[in-house]
């Protein structure tokens, strides 16, 4: 008989989006995983949500430019499946990537099934950023010319330039 596991106390909707409240085990695991990823992966300077007051700092970088573009990735966290989390943790050398991926994901609240990264867990932002950074989007952002100002805050990408 399959055994169920719970890594959250409950969930609620905020602006129509499911938010998960981690239990004590998940809070502790999130703290450990945050440390492990931070020690093993260096984020590009245009990833702003790991700094104090970062959303304001990120936007100020764009103020002197003439043209502006903002991209919001819909359901970004909930599009990141457990296997992807495991694969990226393994790639940066985090021990027991299957374990951390299992306990960092929840059953997908949207159609599509599987287990996904939830909003509300302590480790979700750094895991989502790791995956975005190593995705074709992250590679594209790194390849943009220096004349383009770029910033990433959670699932929002801002680009700006003078021409």
Name these PLM-found stretches.
Residues 8, 16-70:
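Active-site-proximal segment of RNA-dependent polymerases
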Residues 3-10, 60-154, 158-163:
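Conserved polymerase palm-domain catalytic core
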